[in-house]
Design a protein with these regions (language model features):
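Tandem CBS (Cystathionine beta-synthase) repeat/Bateman regulatory domains
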Residues: 1-172
Length: 172
């Protein structure tokens, strides 16, 4: 298991939730994605996959090759399906049960397009890759909820801030 520290996405000031601040609208996946992703190799064991999910409270993780190219995704549903089908999973590697039919986005993908993909495919995460399929990050339903919360809090704070008294224009 390794932490992917690659960070080639949008720049700017980040708030405590890791979301951009400073007046720029959050419009792309790169603005809100999780950049520091813990990944696994296709050769890791089923047991290691379960340990990773339990330790980090993940519902899914990304599988990359030695060159950091995305090769698969494992979800908690994939693990449950494997457990239902095969009672003894000793010796089973991640490559035997990871999803290979990958639905991805790039850091420049518009948020509305990413949400549409997640809703239409009924998935809870999208791996974020560059043009050569190198992993840049992940965007999850939790990332969207954090973004929404941050936007709501910002709107509420603006609504609650004292407004400067309006002075009528005087005619000369």
């Amino acid at each position: 298991m390794k932490a992917n520290k690659k960070n080639n996405t949008a720049e700017g000031n980040l708030n405590s939730n890791g979301l951009k601040t400073g007046g720029e609208p959050l419009t792309t996946v790169g603005d809100v994605m999780t950049r520091h992703v813990i990944t696994m190799s296709p050769h890791h064991s089923f047991s290691e996959a379960i340990t990773l999910m339990a330790t980090h409270s993940f519902r899914h993780f990304l599988v990359v090759d030695k060159a950091n190219r995305l090769v698969g995704v494992v979800s908690d549903r994939d693990i449950l399906r494997m457990l239902a089908r095969t009672p003894n999973l000793h010796g089973t590697s991640v490559s035997q049960f990871m999803s290979r039919d990958l639905i991805t986005v790039t850091p420049n993908t518009r948020l509305s397009h990413a949400v549409g993909k997640m809703l239409s495919k009924r998935i809870n995460c999208l791996p974020v890759v560059d043009d050569t399929k190198n992993l840049c990050g992940i965007i999850t339903s939790t990332d969207f909820l954090k973004t929404f919360r941050s936007m709501q809090e910002s709107a509420e704070n603006q609504a609650e801030s004292p407004k400067s008294p309006h002075k009528p224009h005087s005619k000369i």
